[in-house]
Amino acid sequence: MAEHYFSSAPAVASDPALVGLHLPGLELSLLADRGVFSSRRVDPGTLALLRESPAPPVAGQLLDLGCGYGPIACALATRSPGATVWAVDVNSRALELAASNAERLGLHNVRVALPDEVPETTRFDGLWSNPPVRVGKEALHDLLATWLPRLTDASSAWMVANKHLGGDSLAAWLTGQGWAVRRAASKSGYRVFQVAR
């Protein structure tokens, strides 16, 4: 079976490269590597998510679920220096890169963690994710069913999914689970959703 970016320990040879994250009012240079999601450029879905979601809360606990090398976490931490940003992934190489990028950028408010390293009592004032749709529907649904209930009552999740990789069916599934889902934007085949209680 081919190795994927959601493998816990990528075996593919390392070949790090710098990629640029270009957003209105924010330019970040991030180190990426083979064996992690979108290792040669910031994924267009991630860009759509960051461009179309509102500014994050200025304080509280924020979650980047499936953080990869950290473009979402680093953007959130830069925009909300008073918040704690949890960068969570199962991929060890991704976590090393996310930690390195946060440190290099002086973002001391980023906490890089495996899923089981996040205290169970932690509740989130916002969740952002370009979720790993290629992991399969069942695993994706389990992932979201685990983390979405950890949102505080007044907070939202912001997610992006490619229309051609099940973005609309993901929104329908979330609605069927009792979540209020609003399509905030549709850009170049990517759906940006707000998910709330």
Please give the residue ranges for each predicted region:
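Conserved SAM/SAH cofactor-binding pocket of Class I
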Residues: 45-129
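N-terminal auxiliary segments of SAM/dcSAM-dependent transferases
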Residues: 1-24, 34-35, 39
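Conserved beta-strand signature within the Rossmann-like core of class I S-adenosyl-L-methionine
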Residues: 154-161
